[in-house]
Amino acid sequence: MLRLGLVDFDTSHVVEFSQRFNQTHVASDQHVTGARVVAGIPGSSVMAPERIAGFQPQVEACGVEIVNTPDELLQRVDAVLITSLCGGAHLESARPFLEAGVPTFVDKPFANSWEDALALAELARKHDAFLWHASALRYTQEMQSLQSRLNEIGPLHGAVSYGPAWHADGNPGLLHYGIHSTEQLFALMGPGCESVVNMSTPQSDAVVGTWKDGRQGVVRGGRCGHTAYGILAFTEQGVLNELVSTKYAYRNLCQAIADAFQSKQAPVELDETLEVIRFLLAANESAKRDGSPVLLEEIGNTK
């Protein structure tokens, strides 16, 4: 049984993950096999420090030991999950574990800046540490079904992914919640986006990405009214329309985490994760420029 550690308790994900890995306080159809959360560091928070005190006892109720330092956690675990609510905290929270070569999963958003994203990737490569990231929205039942159906009626010519895109101080623009719909889009389209245009209003974002092969993918992120998740896929032989349920999203993500830590095979390549972050940063930049196109290669390029 793989021993997992959690780092930073300012998100409900620490409760959701602990319950599923440890098979407690959730229905049996939510149980995950192959790994167990054995210890965690409550840590600190730049976005919601008041939430830690509420989530910590719920995590402890799952049988998780509380420790205070990375060294203590390193003595107890085989792999870690960095769960800080703020993407800007992930680099420093992950650093001691990556430097120790410990397999690491980073929760959303992977990073809030291109510099941090590159630094995380470089730490993993330098210390030969297994590192990956994914949104739970990649792992819904509907997305998995849609991906299998594409094999029958593809190829895919484009897609529209939609869902909530609430903003929060600490995770700029689409990085906070728009990342979920963006990861849905990339799960279908794959990497290769060159440029984005974001027509943003206080109510929503409409981001059009253009891929190297001419395909276009759209992220529609809402901040008012009903904000369900869903996706439209435009294929050679038809148009597929899927409303997406999150019922099994956490379970499927947690199972993917356990399986990936066992196999050391990342379901989402690190280069794709870096492109997703660059896409979101470019979308935020396009919004600042009143919808002007932004090349992904502009992000982080100071020349």
Where are these regions (language model features)?
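Rossmann-like dinucleotide-binding domain that binds NAD(P)(H)
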Residues: 160-226, 271-278
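Interdomain hinge/lid region at the active-site interface
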Residues: 225-265
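A contiguous active-site-proximal alpha/beta segment in oxidoreductase catalytic domains
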Residues: 111-171
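Short helix/strand-capping hinge loops at secondary-structure junctions
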Residues: 101-103, 108-109
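Hydrophobic residues in well-ordered beta-strands that form the structural core
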Residues: 68, 106, 131-133
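C-terminal helix-rich "cap/oligomerization" subdomain common to oxidoreductases
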Residues: 72, 76-84, 260-303
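N-terminal glycine-/serine-/threonine-rich beta1-alpha1-beta2 phosphate-ribose binding loop
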Residues: 1-100, 125-126, 287, 296
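Aromatic/hydrophobic pocket-lining residues that form π-stacking "cages" and hydrophobic walls in ligand
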Residues: 93, 120, 146, 282-283
